[in-house]
Amino acid sequence: MVMTPREIVQELDKHIIGQDDAKRAVAIALRNRWRRMKIKDPVLRNEIMPKNILMIGPTGVGKTEIARRLANLAKAPFIKVEATKFTEVGYVGRDVDSIIRDLTDMAIKQEREFAMKKVEHLAEDAAEERILDVLLPPARGTLTPGEKNTTARQVFRKQLREGELNDNEIEIEVAATPVGIEIMAPPGMEEMTSQLQSMFQQVGSYRTKTRKMTVAKAMKILREEEAAKLINEEDIKLKAIESVEQNGIVFIDELDKIAKRSDTVSGGDVSREGVQRDLLPLVEGTTVSTKYGMVKSDHILFIASGAFHVAKPSDLIAELQGRLPIRVELSALSVEDFVRILTEPSASLTLQYSALMETEGLTLTFDETGIRRIAEVAWQVNERTENIGARRLYTVMERLLEVVSFEATDKAGETVHVDKAYVDKNLGQLIADEDLARYIL
């Protein structure tokens, strides 16, 4: 069962502060994938296209973080790419079709993991038998069903399952690792070189060799080997392609960097506009050739994001604007947002630093006045210099706790309490001097 929009938003709330509109848009889009698959009429189901999303907002407000967290929530093929990495066909760089190829690779890996999980108990039993054959070699080369249940074998089996034999060394025959052949791909020819690499790897994939290792390590290797024998690679390919076509999600970051500004004319803009034109068929729906077969992009959900500081969404070519119908604006962060970022997420910065210092035996605590002062400092520096959003908190926290981090080993058993006075003492001079703040914070 896929999560409801409310559950998705609640899960995102654990990691991202504010930006409710963006969370709701993403949650609805994710749920609509499931709703579409539940429609019984195949003709109608095929006609329902995903509504692609464009997230607009300054840097450091949570656009990329929403994508990261969404990847964990979406039990579907998901890939995040930077728009700046791609160039128009004919220019040096990657072409946009490689997005779908990478997404398919991701789906193959995902489906293989699912398939291996289903057969893990059978693989475990087969690996166990192979190890017991080494520990108790059969007299005539093969074991009869009766011999598999002898008392000695059962004793060893019990010890093996309880981990008593984990450190024992054994010699076992395992598949030889294919020789890794690294081929440097010329721009735009990654697909051909990856096929060459896989061809060379398959040449030596059926060889075996005897290796000496601990029982624990042998168990892990043999479990993977046995699981690989039990799964059907053709089924995995078919399921992966279907999963990409019906449930795939592509997150395109930094879209504003390939927008052509209306008031500038430069040679680089030709390639930028070319990337937008190349993205059009992909976003609207086309068929891309991959090493696993043809993949249709008609029902893949595209989520794009950009700061749009210099360029505006209207600077994108009209056809691409039309293919991103849902627009969501993310707001700049306030002092209150910074306070919440430092305290509310399940892995907040204050918790992270406290946990790091705890490994040295030093107790690091933060009170409300200290947290609010850190938030105020970060907000002030953002206002006076470049606004880099929540990323400013990393810089401020590193600077604030630099001495503590350096001397933590010598202060084991002590407690460092971060309050307003502590923040002012360690950052006061930097805050007062704007030039220093510009370069250090």
From Swiss-Prot:
InterPro entries: AAA+_ATPase, ATP-dep_Clp_protease_ClpX, ATPase_AAA_core, Clp_ATPase_C, HslU, P-loop_NTPase. The keyword Cell wall biogenesis/degradation does not apply. ATP binds at residues 17, 60-65, 253, 319, 391. Keywords: ATP-binding, Chaperone, Cytoplasm, Nucleotide-binding. It is found in: Cytoplasm. GO terms for molecular function: ATP binding; ATP hydrolysis activity; peptidase activity; proteasome-activating activity. Pfam families: AAA, AAA_2. One of its GO terms (cellular component) is HslUV protease complex. GO terms for biological process: protein unfolding; proteolysis involved in protein catabolic process. A double ring-shaped homohexamer of HslV is capped on each side by a ring-shaped HslU homohexamer. The assembly of the HslU/HslV complex is dependent on binding of ATP. PANTHER family: ATP-DEPENDENT CLP PROTEASE ATP-BINDING SUBUNIT CLPX-LIKE, MITOCHONDRIAL-RELATED (PTHR48102), ATP-DEPENDENT PROTEASE ATPASE SUBUNIT HSLU (PTHR48102:SF3). ATPase subunit of a proteasome-like degradation complex; this subunit has chaperone activity. The binding of ATP and its subsequent hydrolysis by HslU are essential for unfolding of protein substrates subsequently hydrolyzed by HslV. HslU recognizes the N-terminal part of its protein substrates and unfolds these before they are guided to HslV for hydrolysis. Belongs to the ClpX chaperone family. HslU subfamily. This is ATP-dependent protease ATPase subunit HslU.
